[in-house]
């Protein structure tokens, strides 16, 4: 490592500490505001103590209704049980919290906005019945899962797409940088966490160069995921160099009915022809530039060909959903180009995304279906293993069948 690299790393470390401190301050301030709101609610309840018997009766009746609603819902048991216990043990607190954040469906205005964008975007996805039939004929089990994805998430299956798998995140980053430098029309990037440090600076330099060449660059990130990594002036800094930024569900100092919904997508789209996705965010620890949790193991994939269209639609859906209509795209067709790429590989590719506006757990259902249909082996690679009871049961059952 050269002296200059050491100085840059030291500078990134100091800046990282400052950003973490800034994020902690934001969290603390927001926590204090939420506590004050909670204290106000408790004070109001105390003031209404003279109506305690009536309030208590109504709360218990409502608690019973909510417990029955939860029991009949299609949520997983790991999602139901904490709410059921909280509501039964602490009815007033449990009912209040559930009505505030447990419904997890967003506001009516937000739902209408998502629905409107989906009505405009989803019809632009191809509907290749021949491709579906070919998959179903060649691999019936995969065909069934593919049909489920298309029916419940609206994303189709493709051919004519080449895939490269990266067993380390840093390899994916290197390939990503090389492809970003070749962008001619647009670059879309959507990530749960962005850290304004070494890894991002490598990307930012390429993005700034592409902006000067007339390329439209959009960056989208989750506020909670990035809260300890970037300062509040990050968007202003990016806009000053021509990089357009938007934030998903900003963390505000107050109770928020949509707070529990976070954007965990990791997507890069280049000219609608090349796409990257996988498990890594754009933060130093994912590429082992820093080691706060030891050696980090994550993966990524590169797509080139027709299947990139679904990644483009996924990005445009969320980008337009979080902003006012007058700032949104009036025409999506300019980003959904027809590719003349001829793939070397002959497999089937189906990128898909889940929606925060419904209760269908598409991602989990796909994994459970894959495990249930496995005959020889079922291998997963993830730095996180936080699974539901249903997923755990599926894995155990597969192991009992002799699946590795």
Residue ranges and their predicted role:
Residues 374-375, 384-404:
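Helical hairpin unit composed of two closely spaced alpha helices linked by a short loop
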